[in-house]
Amino acid sequence: MTMPSTPDGTNPFQAAQAQAPLVIGVTGHRDIRKQDREELQTAIKDIFVELKGKYSSTPLILLSPLAEGTDRLAANVALSQQPQVRLFVPLPMRQTAYEQDFQGDSLAEFRDLLGQAEGSLELPLVKGNSSQGILRQGSERDLQYEGVGKYIVQKSQILIALWDGDETDLVGDRKSVV
């Protein structure tokens, strides 16, 4: 796996003074109810504000793969907290393949958020998956989503997990990440 880097080629996990960042991951549902959005935005912002207060000299990085729903909600809140909170985007697969998940305004929003991120990383194929197999909806693609969830858990010191109370057993969803 290659080291993550920003557009200028630096490693986003290293601050100018070589301070170790506090890495915050996010996982949750894609279909956030409209009536819950404002409350969830406030809750995520409160987490960032609290962390900035407790660790004022520590860089904060949010890891978000920018899926619709929770990932983008947290990413937008993080971007509103710049420069204290920076956004880094681990992608579950090549960007062109991942973009097949999004249409119209959603695709435009994904590209806009990715363009505002500090950097991104396309994760390698999960063992046994093929570059053609992940292009179709199904188990190979689901394993890539699970892989990005595992990456976020492994790299994060804090995990923000939003759940609507509905149980699912989907591979790569919030439940399999947490």
Question: What positions do the PLM features span?
Answer:
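Acidic/glycine-enriched connector segments
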Residues: 2-178
